[in-house]
Amino acid sequence: MSLNIFWFLPTHGDGKYLGTSEGARAVDHGYLQQIAQAADRLGFGGVLIPTGRSCEDSWLVAASLIPVTQRLKFLVALRPGIISPTVAARQAATLDRLSNGRALFNLVTGGDPDELAGDGLHLNHQERYEASVEFTRIWRKVLEGENVDYDGKHIQVKGAKLLYPPIQQPRPPLYFGGSSEAAQDLAAEQVELYLTWGEPPAAVAEKIAQVREKAAAQGREVRFGIRLHVIVRETNEEAWAAAERLISHLDDDTISRAQASLARFDSVGQQRMAALHGGNRDNLEVSPNLWAGVGLVRGGAGTALVGDGPTVAARVKEYADLGIDTFIFSGYPHLEESYRVAELLFPHLDVQRPEQPKAGGYVSPFGEMVANDILPKSVSQS
C-alpha cells in the first residue's frame, strides 16, 4: 500500500531543544516558506498547519504559501463554534480554488476550556461535539452545492448556499481526530479520514476497530491516519542520542508546570498522551521505538518514532498494517528534519508522491454575479 506522508509547519515555534530558548529559531514567513518548499520538493504530500492561540492563523499561513509551492497540500483547521459553517464553507471553497485543489480540512473541536472561553465558546465537552456534528453537516452540504436549511440545537441556518464551488468534487476531504466516544461517533458519520495521535499499536488498533464498526453501522467507510514525530538517523544509537538531546534542557520544574497546564484540558486524547509518560522522564520508550519524551512539555502529539531508517520504516509498516494510510510527521528543527526523513526514511517506504495539480483555478468564469446572487445568462458561441 502506498503511504501518504505529510509534514508539519511549526507556526507555534521551532528549535533544536524542547522547553528552552537555547537553540530556538525565529519562525517568520521566510522560515515557513523554506519548510513548505522543502516539503514540496522532497515529495511530502502535504503539511499540517496547527491551530490555537499559540499559533499563527492556519488559513492565512496556507494562503501565503500557496503561490510558492506547486504540489503540496495544506491541511488547515475548521473551528466549529468559532466560525459559522456557511462562512467556513465559502472560505474552504475559495482556498481550494486559489490553491488549484490543494486544500484539505481538519475539524478541530478544541480541548482547552480556558482558550475556548477566551474565543467566546462556552460549551462543555459533550456540547462541543453536538455543535461540531451540526457544523459539519451544514458545511459538507453547502460545499456539495446544496441549498441548506438547518434547525439544530446549537446552529440554525436558512437558505445557506455556495455560489463558487471548490475544485475538488464533491468537496475537499475532511480530516478529524478525537479519542472520546463522541469523537468517534462524529468521525463515523462525517469525515473521510480519522486521525489518532501516536499511541502504541495495540491502542491504535482498538480505536480503528471502534471507528470502523461505527462507520459500518452507517454504511460508510473511513480512512485512517496517525500524527507522530520522527527522530531518524543513520544508526539507532545516533537516533536515541538525538532524542535525549532534544529534552536535555528540561528540568523537573518545567515538566511539572507543563503537565499542570495540560491537565486542565478536557480532551480525552490529551489525557491518553499524558498517561503514556505520567510526567516522568524515565522509561519513555512506551512501545518498541515509540518514545514519549516530546509529550513531557508539548500538548497534542507527544510521541516520536526513533531509530535508523529501516527500524523506523518497520514501525511505520506496523501501523500501516492496522489500516493507516496517512502519516503526519514532524521533527525538531523542522527544516533539517524534513530532509532527514526524506533521505533516511522514504527509501524504505512506498511513498505516494503528489501529482502536479491541473490548471483551472479561477474565480468567475461567467462574469459578475447579478444582484450578488444570480448567475449571468450564458451566451452561446456560434
From Swiss-Prot:
Signal peptide: none annotated. SUPFAM superfamilies: Bacterial luciferase-like. Pfam families: Bac_luciferase (PF00296). CDD domains: Alkanesulfonate_monoxygenase. GO terms for molecular function: alkanesulfonate monooxygenase activity. It is an enzyme of class 1 (oxidoreductase). It catalyses: an alkanesulfonate + FMNH2 + O2 = an aldehyde + FMN + sulfite + H2O + 2 H(+). The keyword Oxidoreductase applies. One of its GO terms (biological process) is alkanesulfonate catabolic process. Its EC number is 1.14.14.5. InterPro entries: Alkanesulphonate_mOase_FMN-dep (IPR019911), Luciferase-like_dom (IPR011251), Luciferase-like_sf (IPR036661), SsuD_RutA_monooxygenase (IPR050172). PANTHER family: ALKANESULFONATE MONOOXYGENASE (PTHR42847), ALKANESULFONATE MONOOXYGENASE-RELATED (PTHR42847:SF4). Catalyzes the desulfonation of aliphatic sulfonates. Belongs to the SsuD family. This is Alkanesulfonate monooxygenase. It comes from Pseudomonas putida (strain ATCC 47054 / DSM 6125 / CFBP 8728 / NCIMB 11950 / KT2440). The lineage of its organism: Bacteria, Pseudomonadati, Pseudomonadota, Gammaproteobacteria, Pseudomonadales.
